[in-house]
Each structure stands twice: as C-alpha cells, then as structure tokens.
Amino acid sequence: MYTFVVRQENSSVYAEVSRLLLATGYWKRLRRDNPRFNLMLGGRNRLPFGRLGHEPGLAQLVNYYRGADKLCRKASLVKLVKTSPELSESCSWFPESYVIHPTNLKTPVAPAQNGIQLPVSNSRTDEREFFLASYNRKKEDGEGNVWIAKSSAGAKGEGILISSEASELLDFIDNQGQVHVIQKYLEHPLLLEPGHRKFDIRSWVLVDHQYNIYLYREGVLRTASEPYHVDNFQDKTCHLTNHCIQKEYSKNYGKYEEGNEMFFEEFNQYLTSALNITLENSILLQIKHIIRSCLMSVEPAISTKHLPYQSFQLLGFDFMVDEELKVWLIEVNGAPACAQKLYAELCQGIVDIAISSVFPPPDTEQVPQQPAAFMKL
C-alpha cells in the first residue's frame, strides 16, 4: 500500500489525480501533516523541499520541481532566455522583452566601484534604459512599436497594458506593486476566420522524475470573440484570449467555439482547408523544439536525480503564431488548469507516467506502458 498527502485543495487537476489513485485500491490518502508519505500533491508555493527524502526507508515524490519558477515567472523567463548559454544566442522564438521594476519598489543596488553606496532605488536588474533605446530605435525606423506590459506573477489577464507609448507603459508599471515585463507585442498574428480573431495555443507538458519530457498530444486554442484591431488598445476582448476576460467582457463569448476553445483536430482541419498546411508540419514541430529547448536549459538547476527525493511536474506552455506561421513562446504556467473534456485522459497520464513509474502497481513487475495520449520528446 502506497500513501499520499494532498496539500493543494484547489487544484482540479490534482483532485482528479487523487481520485484516480484511490480508485486503484493500493493508494491510501493520509492527513496533510503526516510526514511519512510516498507522494505529496502540494501547491507550488511553500513546498517543504528541504524536509523531503529524509524519512528512513521511504521513497518520496512531489509534484513540483524546485526552481521551476525560472521558467514559470515572466521576469525569470526573460532572464533565462537572455543569460542561458543554450538559449541566448539561438533563441529566435521569444519576443523581445525587458524586466522593469516599479520605482516604488525600494531595492538596494550594488555599491559603486569606488566604494560609495548608491541610494536606494530600482533593482539592479531593471532594464528600462534598454527598453527605451529599443523603443526609440524602432520609432525612428518606422517599425511597428506596440508593446505589452505584464505583471511577472499575474494571471487571468490582470496587470496588463498594451500601448505604443513608452511613457504610458513605464508610468503604468511604476504605479504597480510588483515586477513587470515589457514585451514586444505580436502585431501581426495569424487570425481565425470567420471573425478575424486572435488565438493562443496551450500545450501541456509532463516532466517525470528522470527528467523525461512528455508532450500531451491534445492541445487547445483559446480564442477571442471579437475582431482583431491592432490600434484599438482599449478593447481587451480583441487582444487578450484569456477565458476570464472573454467571458466577462465579450457579448460574443461562445459564438464561434463552445467556451472559446478549439481543439487540435478542428484546428488541423482549419489549417488544411484555409492554408493548405498541416498542424504537425507547420506548428507542432516548432512547439516541440521550443519546449525541449526551455526544459533542457534549466535541467542542471532543477533536476532531482541526485537528491534524496524525486519530482515531477505538469507545465502549461502558451504560444502564439504570427501571420508567417512562426511560433512564439509567450509564457509557461507551473500549475496549469485543463479543459474539462481532457481531465480524465490527462490525469490518467500523470498517474501512469509520473507516479506509477516510481511506485508501480503491486500486482505486476512491469512498469506501465507510456499512454498513447503522450509523446516523449
């Protein structure tokens, strides 16, 4: 009998995983504060990583990788792309981005070289001067100069401003309470017809305890309800495909797709009929390359191969596609939700790939086969 604890009660994904484990008959759920467990299904914040793996004779597995925030926080992802040797020279799939600290965040900077302590001010990682230089250069060259400011830890479309005015973007950030990223806005996205609408793509990725990378074969397009207009920054519903924004602000929510979601089979049919291309060859090849590049760049920092406990993690990679069919990584979610119709298959894959490979069913010596719903990258 294996045992597990649940320390994240509000995760629909891990609620389903918990249900699947109990249904096997060889997993038992313990009280959340019991230290002698095989598996912890916890929240990604404040996990007790330092206390894991120290129970004598007990293998322990947790559903997050310590340090995965290098990918999953927007500012950290920008820094990773710029500083990682694997990414900095060859990364053409991430929009031009800058980390900006509000001026009201009082963070000491490093001492000057002459030993004089500089006054308390912006963090030393602030990149607003680099942003302004790029902004002014684009303005002089007559290039598209629309940018988007996003809170590093924001979600559900909160803490976002789209503008072509640098001063407006910086003033917006300076009145916030946390770090933001200013990112070049994708002004010419591939649009869906009918409706001339934006979309983004969510792909789910599972990393197991041996750092094998699995891509869930199904993905979902989150679609806008209103026609896209690059110069109308006030209408969030034509720019931001987040479900919360679409559902709350658009009278056309659900008009084109149920729940503003289009799945890969329908998207492939659309690409074939409208553009005479396939999803696999035009878009998925790029998605796979980006996912693998990101995860391999952080492996040395987050792998648990030499630690007394083991980890796995489900990640949500969000992409956009421009009118030239180039795929761009927008962000990585460390605790992704899942489309309702996909829960059963996705969560069964988590059990089979990430959990049963460490704690195999007691009535067989064979490790379960990789579910067909996932592909190993």
Curated annotation (Swiss-Prot):
Obligatory cofactor(s): Mg(2+); K(+)
Pfam families according to UniProt: TTL
Superkingdom as given in the UniProt entry: Eukaryota
SS bonds (residue pairs): none
Keywords from the UniProt entry: ATP-binding, Ligase, Magnesium, Nucleotide-binding, Potassium
GO cellular component, one term: spindle microtubule
EC number: 6.3.2.25
Domain TTL: 3-370
One BP annotation, GO: post-translational protein modification
Alphabetical list of SUPFAM superfamilies matching this protein: Glutathione synthetase ATP-binding domain-like (SSF56059)
Reactions that this protein is recorded to catalyse: C-terminal L-alpha-aminoacyl-L-glutamyl-L-glutamyl-[tubulin] + L-tyrosine + ATP = C-terminal L-alpha-aminoacyl-L-glutamyl-L-glutamyl-L-tyrosyl-[tubulin] + ADP + phosphate + H(+)
Gene3D superfamilies, per the entry: 3.40.50.11480, ATP-grasp fold, B domain
GO molecular function per UniProt: ATP binding; tubulin-tyrosine ligase activity
Top EC group: ligase
Subunit structure as annotated in this protein's UniProt entry: Monomer.
Protein family per UniProt: Belongs to the tubulin--tyrosine ligase family.
Chain's role: Catalyzes the post-translational addition of a tyrosine to the C-terminal end of detyrosinated alpha-tubulin.
Name recorded for this polypeptide: Tubulin--tyrosine ligase
Source organism (scientific name): Rattus norvegicus
UniProt gene name: Ttl
